[in-house]
Regions:
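Solvent-exposed segments in extracellular or luminal domains encompassing
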Residues: 85-104
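Beta-rich, blade/repeat-based domains predominating
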Residues: 145-168, 206-224, 229, 249-271, ...
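Short loop/turn segments immediately following the C-termini of beta-strands
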Residues: 176-178, 228-230, 275-277, 285, ...
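Short loop/turn segments immediately following beta-strands, especially the blade-tip
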Residues: 193-197, 239, 283-290, 337-363, ...
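Loop/turn-rich, solvent-exposed surfaces of beta-rich toroidal or solenoidal domains
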Residues: 377-433
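Blade-level signature of beta-propeller repeat domains, shared across WD40, Kelch, NHL, RCC1
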Residues: 441-474
Length: 474
């Protein structure tokens, strides 16, 4: 195409090479005209693109870009978590929104060809505990043993199967005190309740090996592993109610917490047991028998006597992230042991600073040992007052109950929602479940029913009953 020796011409925007050759008496000149730089593109997503999470949970943001040299992040709200400033051209980040609401995350990327941006939106719904506070409460039934009148319910868990005396979904409770006695730690019974309002308690087992039972967990065959403080045993009760002591008895130091962990990959099934000497043990299982014993942690601060014991308790396991949570009553803290299945003998030394004050509360601990990096404090103080029990909610948060030992003027019988990903751990406000005498809350359990409702059960020591709260899915 011939063109004038000077001038301009508009052409369509295309990616091509332009060549202009000019001739004269001395020959031709043909300068190279490079194509324009390509515009950046950005792909930016959160799980489900437009997603909803409960307050207290984290969101993973992921992005890729092309033709970009730099990117800048921003959020529509200062409650969106830490997603601001410079980011690489491709990457991902996990953010924990700090309040309910609608949040838009924006990523703007720039390159030599221009700029482009993309957004993703997240709805942060109310926390589960905040919905519990307005939900109705139902009395399931009395926890008093129908034969001996043992009372003062401590341990509480749910049956995973139907076997022997137990039906799947039944509530299994152990009583800390013997009938007609006020002395703490004398109870010797485990009872069951069908999970319907007005249920009557039925006896599962009675034995001196269960004396002072304060926590329990069920194996897949409904065998009951019980922490028997006074007996200094960890008996195993069959679903038919037969009590045995298959585990080494010389290794316990007054068991005070229990959690069962199913086999996962190369990790065999195990029981985790906390003791009143401040240690955490792992009993590796072969069926219902012990194949190995490992003390994975020691050093939690302990003190007190039955009825006012400060020791690690409330053991709760999250199988999705192989994490064991421990309620540290002495320091008013909740501790996480991550990758707990891989923690070896003496792997965590808890530096509890037990002698730094005259008595509880003690400072939140630090950690040393070969697996020290697996241990961290996820919440401390903030209204926790001698916390004792915990359960895992459907979204991965914990519900934690105070034991109210020497509570003074503080509000008694409160539960807290604790997030392992939210800075500081505390989600929303605590909820008071019983307005009566302090120290009503002991065992607590959580599940999800067939309709997707979050169910929370708790032992109310003031009423010697199991209570139920239901929260419908959002």
């Amino acid at each position: 195409m011939r063109v004038p020796d000077c001038g301009c011409r508009a052409i369509p925007f295309i990616t091509t090479t332009l060549l202009v050759a000019c001739g004269g008496g001395g020959g031709y000149s043909a300068p190279y005209m490079p194509p324009p730089a390509a515009m950046p593109t950005v792909t930016f997503t959160a799980p489900g693109q437009s997603t909803t999470v409960n307050f207290g949970r984290a969101v993973k943001l992921t992005w890729t870009s092309t033709n970009a040299t730099s990117c800048t992040a921003s959020t529509s709200s200062n409650t969106g978590g830490t997603f601001t400033g410079s980011e690489p051209a491709s990457g991902s980040v996990t953010v924990a929104p700090t309040a309910p609401g609608n949040i838009t995350y924006t990523l703007a990327c720039m390159g030599t060809g221009g700029s482009a941006s993309a957004t993703t939106s997240v709805t942060v719904a109310d926390s589960i505990l905040s919905m519990l506070s307005v939900a109705g409460m139902t009395t399931i039934g009395s926890t008093i043993d129908p034969v001996s009148a043992d009372y003062n319910p401590y341990g509480l868990t749910l049956a995973p199967a139907t076997a022997g005396l137990i039906t799947q979904g039944d509530l299994v409770v152990c009583n800390f005190n013997a009938g007609m006695q006020t002395q703490q730690g004398t109870g010797t019974t485990v009872i069951g309740l069908h999970p319907t309002a007005g249920a009557m308690p039925y006896r599962i087992a009675q034995s001196a090996d269960l004396q002072g039972c304060n926590a329990l967990t069920l194996l897949p065959d409904d065998s009951i592993s019980a922490a028997a403080y006074t007996a200094n045993e960890n008996p195993l009760v069959t679903a038919a109610g037969v009590v045995g002591t298959p585990f080494s008895t010389d290794v316990f130091a007054h068991p005070w917490g229990e959690a069962y962990v199913a086999a996962n990959g190369t990790n065999p099934a195990a029981l985790y047991v906390s003791n009143v000497d401040g240690s955490i043990d792992r009993i590796t299982l072969d069926g219902d028998t012990q194949s190995a014993f490992t003390q994975i942690a020691s050093g939690f601060c302990t003190s007190g006597t039955p009825g006012a014991i400060f020791a690690p308790s409330g053991l709760t396991y999250d199988a999705s992230i192989d994490t064991l949570y421990i309620v540290d009553t002495s320091s008013n803290s909740v501790i996480a042991f991550t990758s707990v299945s891989g923690i070896g003998s003496g792997g965590i030394v808890v530096n509890g600073q037990c002698s730094s004050v005259s008595g509880p509360p003690t400072p939140a601990p630090t950690f040393s040992g070969s697996s020290a990096t697996s241990a961290r404090v996820i919440a401390t103080g903030g209204g926790l007052f001698t916390p004792l029990s915990a359960a895992l909610l459907s979204d991965g948060d914990l519900i934690v109950a105070n034991a109210d030992i020497n509570i003074g003027s503080q509000t008694p019988n409160q539960v807290f929602e604790i997030s392992p990903v939210l800075p500081g751990g505390f989600v929303g406000q605590p909820v008071q479940l019983d307005s009566g005498a302090p120290g009503a809350l002991f065992g607590i359990a959580a599940t999800v029913d067939s309709q997707g409702n979050q169910i929370v059960y708790f032992n109310d020591d003031n009423a010697n009953a199991v209570m139920k709260i239901t929260v419908a899915p959002q």
